[in-house]
Amino acid sequence: MSTNRVAIVAVVAVLLAGAVFAVRSFADDAPMPQAGQAAPDFTLPSQDGSNISLDSFRGKWVVLYFYPKDMTTGCTIEAHNFQADIDKYQKLDAVVVGVSVDSTGSHKEFCAKEGLSFKLLSDQDKKVVAQYGSMADYMGVKIAKRNTFLIDPQGKIVQVWTGVKPSEHSKEVLAALNGYEKK
């Protein structure tokens, strides 16, 4: 075999391997559920060690927010803002639930350090993050994208926010929730 043919075969092999890797990288991230669809149910452990099912919140509004990492600047700002507004959410019969790929121990430390009273769920196997189309790859590490799903008391998604700004997001969600409550 000539040197040119060997080089061509090598290039094709590398391209095929890259294509297989790319397909595998994206295959674990399902399409994002949209407004009007039933929210996919799941059960995950929380910062206090209890297992929490999305279905256990039936009859209440749910603010299900995915975030990249405990104790980072943007995630701390977003969590502080949800906490600052927690009484407003409760008056609207809504619960705030955060999900990241961090451990329950990390969540427990984050809640204690930042004074968070709402549930943070640990999705270390990344199945729920993927199920909600919220997987991101950060320098080769799979983390959650900053996405939020507003779920009505019957378990239907009514609004989705993607790539949110942590400093403004809780106010956006409250405004939307107030609008749905008035309908």
What is the predicted role of each segment?
Residues 33, 42-62:
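A short beta-strand-turn-helix
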Residues 39-40, 61, 145-147:
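Short loop/turn microsegments at loop-to-beta-strand junctions
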Residues 55-76:
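Short active-site neighborhood of thiol/selenol oxidoreductases, capturing the structured segment around
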Residues 71, 76-116, 124-129:
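Structural microenvironment flanking redox-active thiols in thiol-disulfide oxidoreductases
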Residues 116-118, 135-138, 142-149:
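Structural micro-motif
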Residues 143-183:
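Thiol-/selenol-based redox modules, centered on thioredoxin-like
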